[in-house]
Amino acid sequence: MSSISQNDLSNLDDGSKKEIMTFLESENSKQKVQMSIHQFTNLCFKNCISNVQNADLSSQEEQCLNNCVNRFLDTNIRIVKGLQSIQ
């Protein structure tokens, strides 16, 4: 895989630079979402699943996971709103 030098970037027109920046921002956003999903999956699995006995979740495990993910999302939304109100 080749790398892009600063010189290569400086040779691009403004439209291409903007397109690359938009692409990078999109990829960065995707990465943040994936990291959040991994984080709450890991946290909720540790909190809700004590013993894996088969491929299916018990009703208690399923309810615990649903509640955990919902609380995680609610908390993140509240934090984002709080940060936005500060700005």
From Swiss-Prot:
Keyword Nucleotidyltransferase: no
Keywords associated with the record: Chaperone, Disulfide bond, Membrane, Metal-binding, Mitochondrion, Mitochondrion inner membrane, Protein transport, Translocation, Transport, Zinc
One GO term describing the cellular component: mitochondrial inner membrane
Swiss-Prot/TrEMBL domain comment: The twin CX3C motif contains 4 conserved Cys residues that form 2 disulfide bonds in the mitochondrial intermembrane space. However, during the transit of TIM8 from cytoplasm into mitochondrion, the Cys residues probably coordinate zinc, thereby preventing folding and allowing its transfer across mitochondrial outer membrane.
UniProt subunit comment: Heterohexamer; composed of 3 copies of TIM8 and 3 copies of TIM13, named soluble 70 kDa complex. Associates with the TIM22 complex, whose core is composed of TIM22 and TIM54. Interacts with the transmembrane regions of multi-pass transmembrane proteins in transit.
Family: Belongs to the small Tim family.
Protein name, UniProt field: Mitochondrial import inner membrane translocase subunit TIM8
Native source organism of the sequence: Kluyveromyces lactis (strain ATCC 8585 / CBS 2359 / DSM 70799 / NBRC 1267 / NRRL Y-1140 / WM37) (Yeast)
Gene name linked to the record: TIM8
